[in-house]
């Protein structure tokens, strides 16, 4: 039995990183993919979208795209660059909303992002929230959005927890179904393993087929 994403994609499953600027999206992308992107602590550190493969499953391809950070009252000179980079997120299977949980204005930042997602007619794309920079928080943190996870992207154990969280969220966007393949259809089997998540692979001797 294997599973297939609800949103069709010829390139496996696509994750799109979004969030208010300086939330730590590029750091998360680097930690998950070793992409080596520019990640200085400043506004608009990412102006060009960057897509890399993230190793969540053995064969199934999952990609992660970083985009320019959202901001209130975006300067006119950056509107075009902002819109063009967000086009990279318009066709993703799952939005990963990164929030700087240590910022006192994090709730306002969340609202800014959600409002812009709605304005761009991307609200139907499933979204999960990653509350980042929890190592900088004093006291208890109360998240506003769910499903969500609280991490510090510079903590190795937290990065592993994030990977496990994303794996479960990817699976949650999929529909299970069963398919039979003849033993001679090795090319088709390889393609399925790359483009879908194979939960189990069995061989039926009587039918001489894989299931």
Model-identified regions with their sequence ranges:
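Conserved RecA-like P-loop NTPase ATPase core
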Residues: 28, 66, 85, 96, ...
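Structured loop/turn residues at secondary-structure junctions
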Residues: 20, 101-102, 154, 184
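Conserved G1/Walker A P-loop phosphate-binding module
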Residues: 1-79, 86-90
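Conserved C-terminal guanine-recognition region of P-loop GTPase G domains, centered on the G4
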Residues: 57-61, 82-149
């Amino acid at each position: 039995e294997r599973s297939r994403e609800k949103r069709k994609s010829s390139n496996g499953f696509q994750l799109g990183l979004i969030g208010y600027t300086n939330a730590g999206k590029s750091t998360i992308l680097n930690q998950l993919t070793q992409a080596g992107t520019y990640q200085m602590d400043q506004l608009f550190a990412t102006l060009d979208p960057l897509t890399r493969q993230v190793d969540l499953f053995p064969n199934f391809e999952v990609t992660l795209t970083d985009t320019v950070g959202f901001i209130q009252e975006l300067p006119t000179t950056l509107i075009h660059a902002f819109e063009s980079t967000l086009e990279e997120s318009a066709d993703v299977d799952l939005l990963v909303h990164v929030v700087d949980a240590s910022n006192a204005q994090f709730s306002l930042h969340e609202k800014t992002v959600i409002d812009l997602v709605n304005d761009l007619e991307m609200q139907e794309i499933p979204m999960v929230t990653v509350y980042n920079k929890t190592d900088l928080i004093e006291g208890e943190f109360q998240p506003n959005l769910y499903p969500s996870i609280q991490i510090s992207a510079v903590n190795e154990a937290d990065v592993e927890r994030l990977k496990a969280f994303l794996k479960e969220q990817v699976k949650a966007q999929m529909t299970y179904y069963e398919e039979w393949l003849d033993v001679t259809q090795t090319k088709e089997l390889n393609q399925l393993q790359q483009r879908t998540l194979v939960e189990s692979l069995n061989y039926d001797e009587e039918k001489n087929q894989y299931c």
